[in-house]
Amino acid sequence: MRIGIIGGGAAGMAAALAASEYKNAQIVLMERQARLGKKLSATGNGRCNLSNLHAAQGGYHGDEPGFHEYALSQYPPAETLEWFRDLGLYTVTEASGKVYPYSDQANSVVDVLRFALDRPNIEVLTDFEVMKVRKDGDAFHVTAKDRTLVFDKLIIACGGLAGTKLGGTMAGYKLLRSFGHKCTKLRPTLVQVKTSWPGVSGLKGVRANCHAAIYHNAKLHRESVGEIQFTEFGLSGPVIYEISRDACQGSGEWECRLDFLPDLRASELMRPLMMKRNSNLNAEDLFTGILHNQIGRAHV
């Protein structure tokens, strides 16, 4: 049985390894770019957060709430880590439940998958851009610029439009539409937030833990606690990724509020501030010892 897989990212490589276990299966993995796993190499700021041991129902959002339950029940995080361990990848789990390669390098994950593909019944084709796919009876005809390959089974794992600089295109959507599948409206998710506050560029690169809340028309919409990072045009970081998807889905006024001292009551904070106010300190130094220096100065 010949199995074709379009897309050499994380899903495509994993699919090729799984399919290769079938008796008499011959696998052809087709990738448009010059190398496999280009997006995977960049994920997690180059560290690759490949799972989360605390994955649960409350951590997922979308129009199909049952999908993640099915996926996690079929292949829970513990089994994912065991699968990677069998491939030779050692991992470390942070207190948050996030799992990273022990090397702390996303390229380690890519290399482990790439080395595992070196099997007699797996052929990898890079620089292979699929132009068209058609079904003729029980066979799938996959056409590239210079040739057509025929398969008994076909897996489309092209990935999405995210990360256009890393190769994200509409190609996968077009192939799926050619088979009659419908695509929902595309929206950004896991993205940074652009803000209108003029002082944000001065905090570029600063990281801090805080309570972040997003408001829609002055009403609390979603909140989370964790690390944020300031950019030259706004906010980034895990917490922002978690709440930003909502701001892309509706009109009206959206506001992001940050509390850098969520565990302190206002009364607890006022005493040291009043003491400093009565000293010879400059106003910009009032928050020294309480907040990151640059954040403190931006508040004054």
Where are these regions (language model features)?
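Beta1/beta-strand and adjacent pyrophosphate-binding region of the FAD-binding site
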Residues: 1-11
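Glycine-rich FAD pyrophosphate-binding loop
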Residues: 4, 20-45
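Short hydrophobic core segments
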Residues: 4-6, 30, 130, 149-165, ...
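An anion/pyrophosphate-binding glycine-rich loop and adjacent beta-alpha core
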Residues: 34-36, 41-42, 50-57, 182-185, ...
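Glycine-rich active-site loop/strand segments that organize a redox cofactor
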Residues: 45-93
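Short beta-strand to alpha-helix junction loop
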Residues: 68-76, 95-115, 125, 163-167, ...
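A conserved short coil-to-beta-strand element within the FAD-binding core of flavoproteins
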Residues: 126-139
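Glycine-rich loop(s) and the adjacent beta-strand/alpha-helix scaffold that form part
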Residues: 153-199
